[in-house]
Amino acid sequence: MAVPGCNKDNVRAGCRKCGYPGHLTFECRNFLRVDPKRDIVLDVSSTSSEDSDEESEELNKLQALQEKRINEEEEKKKEKSREKIKLKKKRKRSNSSTTEEDSSKQKKQKYQKKEKKKEKKNKSKKGKHHKKEKKKRKKEKRSSPNRSEVTKK
């Protein structure tokens, strides 16, 4: 049957960390998380006012250490990014200085290819134009004897 102390009326939702009803676990202010990466939690509700100074000092030290770590990590990231940028710049400089002759040769080759393409286009246009003119001449030749015959009669 039902347990005598577990009615819905008797059970009140409360904090699982400190046990006080009035707030939920995620709202608990009686516990402080020292390091967000680790599961180190300090119980503030059980400490007395005399010890609070010592704990606040410890908390300050821990927070200072954590800030130092974060700053060091950021500095390392910045240094790595700077080194990468320097390496990229060095690579670009070395490539450009050693391949100046190659780049000029490549430019000449590109220019020559463009010229060849232009010549081919011009030739094909000329050829088409000549064909049209030949057709016109043939038509004129065919039609001109007919005209001459008509004029003769």
Swiss-Prot record:
For this entry, list what GO says about its biological process: mRNA processing; RNA splicing
| Residue ranges covered by zinc fingers (CCHC-type) | 13-30
Organism annotation: Rattus norvegicus (Rat)
Oligomeric state and partners?
A: Interacts with SREK1/SFRS12.
Tell me the keywords, alphabetical order: Metal-binding, mRNA processing, mRNA splicing, Phosphoprotein, Zinc, Zinc-finger
Biased composition, class Basic and acidic residues, residue ranges: 66-84
Q: Which InterPro entries match?
A: Znf_CCHC (IPR001878)
Q: Where is the composition biased (Basic residues)?
A: 85-94, 106-141
Q: What's this protein's name? A: Protein SREK1IP1
- Pfam families per UniProt: zf-CCHC_3
Q: What does this protein do?
A: Possible splicing regulator involved in the control of cellular survival.
What ranges does the record give for the region Disordered, renumbered to this chain? 44-153
Q: Which GO terms describe its molecular function?
A: nucleic acid binding; zinc ion binding
Q: Does the keyword Transcription regulation apply?
A: no
| Phosphoserine modifications at | 52, 96-97
